[in-house]
Amino acid sequence: MEDDAVDFIREGKEVIGVKTAAGDSIEGDRIVLAGGIATIKLARKLGLRMPMQGGKGYSFTLPKPRKSLRLCSLLKEGRVAVTPMGDSLRVAGTMEICGSDTSVSPKRLEGVVENFCRFYPDFTKADFEGIEPWVGLRPCSPDGLPYLGHVPGQGRVIAATGHVMMGLSLAPATGWLVEKLVSGEASPIGLSQLD
């Protein structure tokens, strides 16, 4: 199902499911809050304060680059990540703390392209012409650590958000930990610093 959860279904004080924007009700034994920056709004409905800011990032996906790259690269000095994805190439970068503002900054886009081309001189700005940029918000917690674990006072609700720039990298480990918590197992690692 692809729809936003907008509220919780309760039996007394216990959360037993979610209501979606389309008006559907979905019940479950466990509810996982894993909506990135959008988790803030939903968590408030539980009386939970989950401080996060949106960290705006940009990317371009070149559908069939004229030069094929085979390895992922993190260009630290240029603040750009390069990810080959099948026949396409994703070039991403920047981190702009912005709340929920998803407006596009031409200066930031230009910086991503210029830095990429500086490290990969076989590419030029012309390779990016006509490519629509993507903009998204990373969920940034104040200390950079994700919110991961049972929500206090809500035994059936588990949080898994706030991974900043490491969401995709930490997804396998986060999924593994959430699976342990959902199945009722004790966490194999201490999560108290992540609460």
Where are the predicted features?
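A conserved beta-strand/loop element that lines the FAD pocket in flavoprotein oxidoreductases
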Residues: 1-6
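Glycine-centered tight beta-turn/hairpin loop motif at sheet-sheet or coil-to-beta transitions
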Residues: 21-23
